[in-house]
Amino acid sequence: MSGSFQLKDENHTVVATAPLKDLFHLPHTLLVDNTYDQLLRGQSSQSVQDFNNVYTEQMTEWLFANKDFGLDIVSLNVQRGRDHQIQGYTTYKYMCGLGSNYVWEDLKDLIPEELVHRLSHAYQNPGDLDMYIAQVMETVLPGTQLGTVIQNH
């Protein structure tokens, strides 16, 4: 996701760039002057970001921000999953018929090795792995934007 949105006039000339953090919970800004139309024109021609597990700083530090601080979308999603008792990634992997996990190496067929290594430092064992974290780290299947477990779940 891009960290900013271009606003374009009727000639498709960029007249402003709006940081994503300035648009959270401020729908009234779209009603001022010609902003809504400018935003739509900008979005229709702004390049789409590749689907990956990298988040813009606007989403990891400034989500729903005031002038001093904001929230982190990744932390918020992990906590939401825990609050709703979403099972861990390895449970869903097993439910999809992809085997069970007892060691970190069992994940390397679905998640790139470097990311598995990083996960092994953040989590005590594979059974603790949050579904949200693992699903955004899964290797994307050809022709899709999803990994194996989330696509089979």
Model-derived segments and their meaning:
Residues M1-H153:
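Polyanionic, low-complexity segments and short acidic motifs
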